[in-house]
Amino acid sequence: MTQWDGRGAFYDCNKLTSITIPDSVTSIGVGVFSGCSGLTNVTIPNSVTSIDFEAFYNCSGLTNITIPNSVTSIGDSAFKGCSGLTSIMVPYSVTSIGYGAFEGCTWLDKIYYQGAAEDWNKIDIENTYNDKLTSATRYYYSAEKPTASGNYWRYNENGEIEEW
């Protein structure tokens, strides 16, 4: 199996709270977790290269999401309505973020990006209905304590995101 295609697979599974997507999956398909409001924890493997249209639509229980280094594309409305989402980790590999990908993410206020500011500016971001994505505070990755002013983050000794 290379793609999880929504079409009813996990649609509106409100009791689903946690899921680890198998390594065999390369694409999280259209609406696969749409309406899973109880979903609080998602582990996405490095085999996934795209998160498609409405993949996590209205997953209001998600508070943060780490997108793996393999993902290049975040589709239209992929995380639309994830009203509990407060932070996301966007890898350097992402080259496009679709229309309304983070629409309705009312509490999204922190974006941890694995690259520098100039790299972020190269991402093809469809700005329509992505206001929270573009207005959230962005933190750029730095393994060493930065000397320049700005917002930076690193991985701590436990592999967790930590702001400098």
Please identify what each model-predicted range represents:
Residues M1-Q3, C13-S27, S37-S50, S60-S73, ...:
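Structural signature of tandem-repeat unit edges
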Residues I123-T128:
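A structural signal for leucine-rich repeat
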